[in-house]
Amino acid sequence: YAMVPACDGELGSVVRVYRDFKNLGDVEFLKTIWPKVVLAMEYALKQWDLDGDDVLDGQQNTTYDIEFYGPNPMTDSIFLAALKCCEEMAEIVGDEEHHQLYADAYEKGAARADQLMFDGEYYIQVQKEIDKYKYQFGKGCLSDQLLGQFLAYMAGIGEILPKEHVKSAMESVFKYNYKTDFYHTDSVHRAYAINEEHGMVVATWPKGGRPKFPLSYAGEVWTGVEYEVAVNLIYSGCVEEGLTVVKSIRDRYDGYKRNPFSEIESGHHYCRAMASWGVLNALLGLQSDMYRGTLSFHPAIEGEMSSFFICGKAWGIYSQKEENGKMCKHIDILYGTLDDIHVQE
């Protein structure tokens, strides 16, 4: 198997640069790494956008151990998130040339991607000859279709595609891919959910169009993807659906049937499950920007609640309690300080 640069991994790393910078607020760190970020984006634009329309359409190696061909929402959403992050990073480091380049590419690419891939319900892969390449998903509903949106939320840049389309896509993933039993689900590789268990499969074809050799992991249940979808659902206002997905994971890894501290994909303690941290941030509505000196909470849960939180300069407990008929917010710092940080309502 020829290992080529991973499209999702490289572009996801660009998004993480901005996420980590905002958590640290260290401009020197950003200035030091910025030239490498520019090189990574130059490679992406040259290697994966073959026709120059700011939508990826080349051979795109991914975490599914295969290459996607043609426009597809999974890698392209990460590309859009990377462009948006780079637009903001370029402004911070004073790189006006690249700031304008990335701003224009994002605006053009987002509009084109939405036009090409949104089918009125969710985002699909665009392929004229779906069976030309093995392991594609075509018109199928991929749970991972808006992985880039998940990364965008974690980086605090909001929606990268029309908000109503993002919500529709996530509702569709829950509608078509969430299973309340696995008696009739084909899983020709590994069975991570069985019998009466609940979970979300990687892909389905509710409107037909399943390729002759489809995405090989389509019938599997990956907790890392489930957490990602849960986060996107919560940010889209579908809190109940998001928590339903999370509960299904915890019910499967309950300490009786499976180890609750080792969520399995390709082996024990698989790192994709660390996407679970995003659920905490989504439920808190936490936005941390140490560069701009702001911290805000907009909880998705109404009513009284209490939760751990962490940002670049402190960690502690956020709570909201009803006092004299009014919901009041409280922040208890257990380590660090927020003295120079503006906590926004």
Where are the regions a protein language model picked out?
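Glycine- and acidic
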Residues: 1-2, 18-27, 62-67, 210-215, ...
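Extended glycan-interaction surfaces of carbohydrate-active proteins
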Residues: 1-4, 47-71, 111-222, 254-255
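Aromatic-rich carbohydrate-recognition surfaces in CAZymes
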Residues: 1-55, 70-90, 103, 145-152, ...
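Alpha-helix N-cap/helix-initiation motif
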Residues: 2-6, 26-34, 68-75, 95, ...
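Short, solvent-exposed positions on alpha-helices
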Residues: 27-32, 97-100, 104, 240-244
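Non-catalytic C-terminal accessory modules of carbohydrate-active enzymes
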Residues: 53, 193-198, 215, 219-220, ...
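N-terminal leader/propeptide and maturation segments of large enzyme subunits in energy/redox metabolism
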Residues: 85-102, 166, 176, 180, ...
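Short amphipathic alpha-helical coiled-coil/interface segments
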Residues: 102-113, 246-249
